[in-house]
Amino acid sequence: MEELKRIITEFRAKRDWGEYDTLERFSKSISIEAAELLEHFQWEESGDNIQEIKDELADVLIYSLAMCYHLGEDPKEIIKEKLKDVARRYPEKR
């Protein structure tokens, strides 16, 4: 995860994209990219172009991770906390 953080942070810094770093803009960008991902399934249940799906998924992940870094939060910890909460609400069935 640290390598990914470095890659994303450096990529954005080299393009001076930091001026756009607000929670609102990250949220909008995540939503827009998620909608673009969903378009691949709008008329069919299985997306035909896996590479395009991967590209849109990467966009969602990049914006999500960049938002975590902007907040000063560790994405792994955010995910672990959420899974603990979900596990309490939805116990295992096995």
Regions found by a protein language model. Give the residues of each.
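Flexible "arm" and connector segments at domain edges
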Residues: 1-57, 61-94
